[in-house]
């Protein structure tokens, strides 16, 4: 959860609390009731001491409250938002009514070039006119940008914010994408002019906090850049603004531009910045729009767009879900306390809520129910014993896994736990298999080692053998864990715990894998382990192979194994696994120096464990 650092004295002043009489415990209770948490009480001096190890007496010793807020409550990421919400909650302020005014003149336009589509296609903008900053509000303005960048903006990769002194610029503005060498300007907090290529090199070689953002656009042949009508660079998103339009305490008119890969997130960020600080404008809670024009010369709209959406919530649903019994009019009153204007439907069976632009977290009636519960007070909710009796128990598949893990350990095998993610080769080519598209791939893999979800336990067992070359032979290891297989979408048969249809496009299988490594391949060791497993599960040997009851073995042509040594395991007429001596090419792929034999079984309740679980129950 994001933490917001706020000066206690400034916060208390904004809330109308008298510092000498309002205690920390009272504030903690207020936070809990509202749904946030006072996580830590510290000071700037103490925070710097913890960071550097040296106490600096020149740093302020004012009390700082660190407040935990929900990750989706972007309106609570600054002093202004928290104070505004708590004042309405405490009946000390009315719900603010945000207003927009059209562009002051034809210069408040932003033109988009076609080239930006390949690098950062979305831009929106707005203006705070006649704003008055104090040192505290200025610091909060900067801090909110950093909080948004770290949260919804995903460290600027998804969205980035640029703020500028409008009086130093001349509209209209132009959003372009140019070659790095063609972008020249003096970046923020610098005195020398750089082109973008030189600037990236400068930041890459320095200890600047901006270094971590360079990879976002570094490999692009063109970089996004915003100019004014006099060809002055406003910003190089998502990296740095220009020094020319730097925001100062004396700034009166603020131009805010937000570039992004996602228009919805861009609008949320722009609206948050504007609504939080519009209270300092000459006309409080008023924002000026900017017209954005696309590459074809067509207007994409005026921003910000602050139309309130409406959500209907059934009165019975709210009462039942929250465990309360209050009237519809009481719900309207409680929602007003949570800064939500609402009214009753004509039949008074539902509540129509006007969701303000600051509450992007409200998307469903359940969110309305949650705010009613907060307004009602969690401490006021009555504890009730459920009118149904349930008995908890272990999931059958987990019970089966635990039973087999104990038995295999008693047979002298060591249990291992390995990574669920792997490379593509571990699912296919390293095991002498062709890629059949059955693996679930990670869309934004952090490492080349972890790009897919494993489809088998064989590869991780072989990796474990390879990693334990220094251990004395024989090596006897096993693992019981899940693998994931890509499956077609469809309606899952809930009565069948092993149904391969999943509403997420993939399904898990519980697998058992065991490996034996020694100077010679002794398949009888693994075969003996299989026989022990079948004995424990009360599955008889079907010597005739005709009854579909019991288990038997048949020759396998799986290229994982040395020809003539691969064996399929058939239980109740279904193939549930295989075992054999691992092929030398596969051993080479995993740098295994000695022969290995492997057993891999799919564990299912209906096929593998029906007898033993029925007996135990």
From Swiss-Prot:
It is an enzyme of class 6 (ligase). Its cofactor is Mg(2+). Keywords: Aminoacyl-tRNA synthetase, ATP-binding, Cytoplasm, Ligase, Magnesium, Metal-binding, Nucleotide-binding, Protein biosynthesis. Residues 306-383 form the B5 domain. Pfam families: B3_4, B5, PhetRS_B1, tRNA_synthFbeta. InterPro entries: aa-tRNA-synth_II/BPL/LPL, B3/B4_tRNA-bd, DNA-bd_dom_put_sf, Phe-tRNA-ligase_IIc_bsu, Phe-tRNA-synth_IIc_bsu_arc_euk, Phe-tRNA_synthase-like_B3/B4, PheRS_beta_core, PhetRS_B1. Mg(2+) binds at residues 361, 367, 370-371. Transmembrane segments: none annotated. It catalyses: tRNA(Phe) + L-phenylalanine + ATP = L-phenylalanyl-tRNA(Phe) + AMP + diphosphate + H(+). GO terms for molecular function: ATP binding; magnesium ion binding; phenylalanine-tRNA ligase activity; RNA binding. GO terms for biological process: phenylalanyl-tRNA aminoacylation. SUPFAM superfamilies: Class II aaRS and biotin synthetases (SSF55681), PheT/TilS domain (SSF56037), Putative DNA-binding domain (SSF46955). Its EC number is 6.1.1.20. It is found in: Cytoplasm. It comes from the Eukaryota. Belongs to the phenylalanyl-tRNA synthetase beta subunit family. Type 2 subfamily. Tetramer of two alpha and two beta subunits. This is Phenylalanine--tRNA ligase beta subunit. It comes from Dictyostelium discoideum. The lineage of its organism: Eukaryota, Amoebozoa, Evosea, Eumycetozoa, Dictyostelia.
């Amino acid at each position: 959860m994001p933490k917001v650092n706020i000066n206690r004295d400034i916060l208390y002043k904004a809330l109308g609390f008298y510092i000498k009489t309002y205690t920390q415990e009272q504030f903690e209770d207020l936070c809990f009731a509202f749904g946030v948490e006072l996580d830590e009480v510290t000071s700037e001096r103490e925070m710097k001491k913890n960071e550097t190890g040296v106490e600096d007496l020149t740093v302020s010793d004012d009390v700082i409250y660190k407040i935990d807020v929900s990750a989706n409550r972007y309106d609570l990421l600054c002093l202004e938002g928290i104070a505004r919400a708590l004042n309405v909650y405490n009946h000390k302020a009315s719900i603010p009514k945000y207003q927009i005014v059209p562009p002051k003149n034809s210069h408040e336009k932003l033109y988009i070039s076609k080239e930006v589509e390949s690098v950062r296609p979305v831009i929106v903008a707005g203006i705070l006119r006649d704003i008055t900053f104090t040192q505290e509000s200025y610091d909060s303005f900067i801090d909110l940008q950093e909080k948004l960048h770290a949260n919804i903006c995903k460290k600027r990769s998804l969205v980035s914010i640029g703020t500028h002194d409008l009086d130093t610029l001349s509209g209209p503005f132009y959003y372009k994408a140019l070659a790095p060498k063609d972008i020249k300007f003096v970046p923020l907090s610098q005195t020398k002019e750089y082109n973008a290529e030189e600037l990236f090199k400068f930041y890459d070689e320095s200890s600047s906090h901006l270094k971590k953002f360079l990879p976002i656009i570094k490999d692009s042949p063109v970089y996004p850049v915003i100019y004014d009508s006099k060809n002055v660079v406003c910003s190089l998103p998502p990296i740095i603004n220009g020094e020319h339009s730097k925001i100062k305490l004396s700034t009166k008119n603020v131009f805010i531009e937000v570039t992004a890969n996602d228009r919805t997130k861009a609008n949320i960020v722009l609206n948050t910045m504007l609504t939080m600080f519009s209270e300092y404008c000459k006309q409080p809670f008023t924002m000026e729009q900017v017209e954005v024009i696309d590459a074809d010369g067509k207007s994409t709209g005026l921003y910000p767009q602050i139309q309130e959406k409406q959500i209907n919530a059934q009165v019975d649903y709210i009462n039942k879900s929250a465990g309360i019994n209050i009237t519809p009019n009481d719900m309207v009153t409680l929602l007003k306390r949570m800064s939500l204007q609402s009214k009753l439907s004509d039949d008074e069976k539902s509540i129509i809520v006007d969701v303000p632009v600051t509450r992007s977290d409200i998307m469903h009636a359940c969110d309305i129910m949650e705010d009613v519960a907060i307004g009602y007070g969690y401490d006021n909710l009555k504890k009730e014993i459920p009118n149904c009796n349930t008995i908890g128990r272990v999931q059958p598949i987990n019970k089966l896994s635990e039973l087999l893990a104990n038995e295999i350990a008693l047979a002298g095998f060591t249990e291992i736990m390995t990574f669920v993610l792997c490379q593509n080769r571990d699912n296919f080519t390293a095991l002498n298999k062709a890629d059949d598209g059955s693996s679930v791939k990670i869309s934004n893999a952090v490492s080349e080692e972890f790009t897919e979800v494993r489809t088998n336990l064989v590869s991780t067992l072989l990796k474990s053998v390879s990693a334990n070359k220094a251990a004395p032979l024989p090596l006897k290891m096993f693992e019981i864990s899940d693998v994931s297989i890509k499956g077609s979408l469809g309606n899952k048969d809930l009565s069948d715990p092993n149904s391969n249809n999943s509403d997420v496009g993939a399904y898990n299988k519980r697998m058992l894998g065991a490996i034996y490594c020694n100077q010679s391949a002794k398949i009888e060791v693994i075969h003996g382990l299989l026989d022990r497993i079948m004995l424990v599960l009360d599955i008889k040997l079907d010597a005739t192979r005709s009854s579909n009851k019991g288990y038997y073995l048949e020759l396998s042509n799986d290229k994982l194994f040395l020809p003539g040594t691969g064996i399929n395991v058939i239980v109740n007429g279904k193939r549930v696994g295989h075992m054999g001596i691992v092929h030398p090419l596969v051993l080479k792929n995993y740098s295994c120096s000695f022969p290995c034999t492997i057993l891999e079984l799919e564990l299912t309740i209906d096929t593998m464990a029906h007898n033993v679980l029925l007996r135990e129950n």
